[in-house]
């Protein structure tokens, strides 16, 4: 499983939830994480072997070509060591180093877990999409009109993917108590989004 860095932890949360459910279905299934996320300690503590490579911005003076070469070398070693039957990537854009590693080590099933559709005019090359055998689109709470490019890869739409199941959720009272919020208070959650990525200054 390869969750990437995003603005928040959406990629990681989906993959972590997927790993927990797969383990529940088959306790003997080997599930390996390879991630650029700093949250690697969470799956590691849960018993999932985890490999980490920091994102390119963490390396001073390193260009994208050098970083992608590191991705290719490390991921190739991981794939060669574990020989997975399925590779699942969760991210907005596939890294060139990742695609090169998948070209080096054959993986029977390659899946791209991507929340958003590939909209017309997208900067994602169609040949990158074609590297995968299956595209999985988790649904959002709000349905969006489809305007997906014709990429020729099988698509599967699934319900929203969450980290925990309904029976694992805290009650309203317990959640407020853990957060230190008065039971009778009106609570508003504000998510400003992607910061510099979405230029939110103009909206605040």
Q: What feature does the model see in each segment?
A:
Residues 13, 195-204:
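A conserved mid-protein helix/loop that constitutes part of the nucleotide-sugar donor-binding site
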